[in-house]
């Protein structure tokens, strides 16, 4: 903040709350105004992957690109109407944001970030739904979501609706005074990262029922002497996975 007083949080405590949001731009209308989509939560967004639920609601998968942060999913209240731009403009304004918990038995749950539900109450320091969204990380902490190894890009397979998410790395996993390993983040000092995947109940991205998950790939050199740094990928060794996408043939 030595260059701009606005970033001195002691003087302007709400200035940080301006950052960490998804902003939607209409590429078809150069006169349009970008819109901040606060319902998608405030955190260190790494992409926003859009899918449609079986009943036409809009689903947005997001990772919080920081050590020990979370995977999120937003499900809109309204339904997408093909070819009706005006009707679809506000779909990302109303809906429920969820945070993921990956359990050791290979199941997972989407936990709703809704004010007044569970621990997200005024008694626990959450004044309103706006407060929950502004402090999405704290809300995830309160709900007991799974702290991940820097979740970044997310891609939904066009074949079978598996969802893939990159965990770039986390050299602090298992360090002193830091969270230890768990089923979804199984390597201490995870310098090479991994890719996790899950399949929503019924193959429906909009489902909030329990899902099944597994680790798709552990990154690193398959010949590395240290098992904690050894990859299991056939082919070229790679580490710190970041972006991923599916081509029209369904190849990741």
Residue ranges, per PLM feature:
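Conserved small-residue
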Residues: 1-252
């Amino acid at each position: 903040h030595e260059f701009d007083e606005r970033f001195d949080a002691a003087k302007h405590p709400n200035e940080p709350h301006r950052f960490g949001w998804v902003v939607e731009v209409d590429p078809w209308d150069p006169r349009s105004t970008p819109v901040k989509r606060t319902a998608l939560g405030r955190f260190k967004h790494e992409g926003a992957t859009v899918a449609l639920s079986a009943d036409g609601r809009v689903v947005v998968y997001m990772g919080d690109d920081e050590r020990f942060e979370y995977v999120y999913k937003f499900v809109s209240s309204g339904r997408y109407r093909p070819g009706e731009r005006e009707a679809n403009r506000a779909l990302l304004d109303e809906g429920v944001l969820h945070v993921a918990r990956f359990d050791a038995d290979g199941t997972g749950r989407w936990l709703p970030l809704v004010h007044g539900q569970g621990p997200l109450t005024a008694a626990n320091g959450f004044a309103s739904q706006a407060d929950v969204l502004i402090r999405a990380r704290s809300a995830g902490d309160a709900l007991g979501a799974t702290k991940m190894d820097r979740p970044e890009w997310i891609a939904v397979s066009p074949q079978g609706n598996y969802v893939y998410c990159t965990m770039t790395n986390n050299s602090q996993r298992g360090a002193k005074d830091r969270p230890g390993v768990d089923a979804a983040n199984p390597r201490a000092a995870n310098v090479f990262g991994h890719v996790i995947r899950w399949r929503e109940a019924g193959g429906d991205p909009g489902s909030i029922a329990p899902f099944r998950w597994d680790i798709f790939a552990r990154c690193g050199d398959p010949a590395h002497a240290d098992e904690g740094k050894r990859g299991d990928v056939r082919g070229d060794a790679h580490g710190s996975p970041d972006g991923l996408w599916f081509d029209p043939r369904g190849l990741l």
